[in-house]
Amino acid sequence: ASPLPDDVTIATKFGSLSRTHLPDGTAVCLNANSTLTYSPAMNGKGTRNVMLQGEAYFEVKADAEHPFKVNTPYMTVTATGTEFNVNAYDSSASVTLINGRVNVGVENQSMTLNPSEHLSLADGRAVINGHIDTEKYCCWKDGMLIFDDEPLVNICNRLQQMYDVEFDVAPELASLTF
């Protein structure tokens, strides 16, 4: 769905973050090279839908009557009041749940995440990992990155997404982990 003329769009450049509160009271931290679009009429009396391209951390204001939906090109995340991170830079999108509960819709599937669970898409399939260190996926909002046993090529891709830098990694080094 494309934005309507009255919709508000927040966009961040490489190397920058944006923190904002939506009209319904939800707090959002938008990562570098990301775009968030929402209706200025999203005031808790109707639908609470946003569109995300990139990455954002959400602290959703509780409202069981009006679910909060994050629509990305790869999945839809639905919450009624919770904290979670959505990474939707590319088709290897992911959701990390800090607290509360969210439903994630991927194609014809719907899955529920519980606190400290991480859902990632790989080759069009959803994989859920439980009891993860949520800080690894959310520390970017505090100006940090954590890598643990991560292939060098993945680290370089993450840095490229955030800082618009290019790396030329020799094939024999690509799978080294850090």
Question: How would you describe each model-predicted region?
Answer:
Residues 1-178:
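A residue-level detector for the "anchor" residue at the start of short, highly conserved motifs
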